[in-house]
């Protein structure tokens, strides 16, 4: 069986972006899940930052995973992947220079595309966890990412959160990233089609949409007409794996089946309340 090179996988992803269809990603988190996704016919996969944190650290999504840890997991996937994989590279693990290092390492790992977001990460002392960096810094990160890539087929996608700012600010940011040379725009927090249309009409590069299964956005044909080429519904496969592991081990110990959901199990074993308490204790301004 022919195993596509990393460049060929990147070209395959570019072809998806150049098409007139809308594709749904498979959540891939290790080599086995990547092989399964390809065998089932998924056109592309995504290694989510939150999922990588769970898989590598058993920690909640508090930007705790390091670039090296993330790249190691991406490399394991890249060794076997027969489908293009997008890396959720969070904020690029630092400033624009860190973004350049991130691109170099993920390109070497075999990733087909990566997203760089403009959220202020990791959370800063005395700042809201939902703050965004300024547009100018976001543009600098995208320009740095483009400069750092060696294979021109590697897709650089600028990501922003449409839920945290008004639509005019979203348009301003996405236009700036488009002008900076981003190959695509990733939108999180889009409410419905009216919200999406207000943003999409200003853009001429492909869109990637993180919907988390939002029922207001379940129309692939309409999404495609608006320029959406990639949809991320979430990471249900990973959480199903957690649930299956828990239920299997409980049964081996002779326990009855549990009614805990996958989401509840994730919280049970990643201790988010502890991290939140530490953040309040060490990172908030005391009155």
From Swiss-Prot:
The keyword Cytoplasm does not apply. There is nearly no change in activity from pH 5 to 10. Belongs to the isocitrate lyase/PEP mutase superfamily. Oxaloacetate decarboxylase family. Mg(2+) binds at residue 88. Its EC number is 4.1.1.112. One of its GO terms (molecular function) is methylisocitrate lyase activity. This is Oxaloacetate decarboxylase.
């Amino acid at each position: 069986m022919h195993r596509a090179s990393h460049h060929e996988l990147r070209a395959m992803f570019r072809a998806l972006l150049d098409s007139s269809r809308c594709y749904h990603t498979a959540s891939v988190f290790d080599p086995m899940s990547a092989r399964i996704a390809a065998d089932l016919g998924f056109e592309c996969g995504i290694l989510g930052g939150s999922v990588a944190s769970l898989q590598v650290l058993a920690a909640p999504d508090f930007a705790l995973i390091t670039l090296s840890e993330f790249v190691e997991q991406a490399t394991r996937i890249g060794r076997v992947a027969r489908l293009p994989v997008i890396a959720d590279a969070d904020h690029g693990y630092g400033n624009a220079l860190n973004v350049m290092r991130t691109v170099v390492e993920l390109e070497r790992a075999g990733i087909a595309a990566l997203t760089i977001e403009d959220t202020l990460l990791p959370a800063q002392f005395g700042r809201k966890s939902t703050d965004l960096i300024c547009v100018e810094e976001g543009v600098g990160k995208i320009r740095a990412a483009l400069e750092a890539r060696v294979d021109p087929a590697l897709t650089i996608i600028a990501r922003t959160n449409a839920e945290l700012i008004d639509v005019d600010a979203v348009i301003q940011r996405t236009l700036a990233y488009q002008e900076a040379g981003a190959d695509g725009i990733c939108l999180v927090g889009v409410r419905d089609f009216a919200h999406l249309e207000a943003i999409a009409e200003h853009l001429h590069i492909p869109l990637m949409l993180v919907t988390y299964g939002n029922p207001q956005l379940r129309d692939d044909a309409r999404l495609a007409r608006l320029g959406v080429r990639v949809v991320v519904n979430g990471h249900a496969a990973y959480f199903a794996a957690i649930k299956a592991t828990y239920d299997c081990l409980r049964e081996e110990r002779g326990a009855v089946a549990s009614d805990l959901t996958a989401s509840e199990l994730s919280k049970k074993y990643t201790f988010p309340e502890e991290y939140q308490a530490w953040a309040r204790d060490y990172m908030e301004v005391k009155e």
